[in-house]
Amino acid sequence: MFACQHEAVVPDFLVLAKGLTGGYLPMAATLTTEAVYDGFLGDFSELRAFFYGHSYTANPLGCAAALASLEVFREEKVLERVASMVPVLTQELAQLRLLPCVREVRQVGMMVGIEVGAADGTGFDWRERIGGKVCLAAREYGLLTRPIQDVVVFMPPLCVSGDEIRFGLEAIGRAVEAVCG
């Protein structure tokens, strides 16, 4: 479920937000190891308590929405569904890798970064904002996405179908060809 699990990393802190409530209410949580938690455990007089909080934590309505969202996540077997869509995404990305201006395609699960560069293998001048131009062109083909410099981000919702994956990647491919030649 978390990126750190794909890398076999056990963090001391894990910060969660946005998706906890399925996007319905603001909610955030900070998870820690038992050792970190114990470091803050104590009476007020010991000055060990972690005095911190904000409107995105411990809100009863947000907590209820988060629990309901997690229940739907389990009931609808979202992780199992995602596991069946990852191979579809991986297979469809093969076509993008063939484009001369696609330098690299990086994928972890359903998260993809498509780096664009000149056909000769060099990068573009960052001031040209080619990634942004590709994303603007993708709108013409029906896809809203965003760049991180010259990397086009493709992160479909976890309820995506194979046809929708193909549609999105086709739009990116057409946009890359339109902008980069």
Predicted regions and their residues:
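Conserved N-terminal phosphate-binding loop of PLP-dependent enzymes in the Aspartate aminotransferase
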Residues: 1-181
